[in-house]
């Protein structure tokens, strides 16, 4: 059984009612993991994600474990979809970028607004999968997104997909589950602790994340 690798994903929503949209893209057919499936931008947590960015703000609201996952989610969203979640920065104080994602924020005069992220929940890939991930999902407000979504080598058909009156049929169970949770958080109707979505004995299970999260 492969050990799941830490990963992170960002659910970006904008609009209301029938104009509600989510940022998503389709994984290429030639990849090993979830080919042809629509997903939110995201990917594995890399070692550099443990280090604070020069251009981040509000990180204390997350705690160390969620902070590095949040960095990974925002970095992957930039790499896969070409957009940044943040807010305009104040006067520059000679900050230096160590990584491409920091440079992207600096060039656009933005701050990575970690305090605008809401923790949605965690999902673990089934044990029979050849590639397994322990993924933490975050919710972000699409009104604070800078840039135009664009397809990359990692995601195709990247755009704001309408979900106000229909669901993307290509979404997997876990994606639909986390989207429903994100919508509940956005609408103020979510209850309980952040959920843990996993599989046991070939059945879908939903537990509670017992990390550093707090009740909503």
Q: What residues fall within each predicted segment?
A:
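N-terminal leader/linker segments that precede catalytic domains of diphosphate-processing enzymes
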Residues: 1-216
């Amino acid at each position: 059984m492969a050990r799941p690798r830490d990963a992170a994903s960002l659910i970006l929503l904008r609009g209301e009612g029938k104009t509600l949209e989510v940022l998503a893209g389709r994984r290429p057919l030639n990849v090993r993991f979830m080919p042809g499936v629509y997903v939110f931008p995201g990917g594995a947590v890399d070692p550099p994600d443990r280090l604070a960015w020069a251009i981040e703000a509000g990180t204390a609201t997350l705690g160390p474990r969620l902070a590095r996952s949040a960095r990974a989610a925002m970095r992957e969203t930039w790499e896969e979809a070409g957009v940044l979640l943040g807010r305009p920065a104040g006067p520059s104080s000679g900050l230096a970028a160590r990584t491409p994602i920091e440079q992207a924020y600096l060039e656009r005069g933005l701050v990575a607004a970690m305090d605008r992220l809401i923790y949605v929940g965690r999902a673990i890939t089934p044990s029979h999968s050849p590639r397994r991930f322990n993924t933490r999902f975050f919710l972000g407000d699409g009104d604070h997104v800078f840039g135009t979504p664009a397809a990359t080598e990692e995601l195709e058909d990247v755009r704001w997909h309408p979900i106000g009156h229909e669901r993307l049929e290509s979404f997997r169970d876990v994606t639909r589950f986390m989207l429903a949770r994100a919508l509940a958080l956005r609408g103020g109707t979510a209850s309980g602790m952040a959920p843990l979505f996993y599989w046991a004995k070939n059945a879908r299970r939903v537990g509670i994340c017992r990390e550093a999260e707090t009740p909503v």
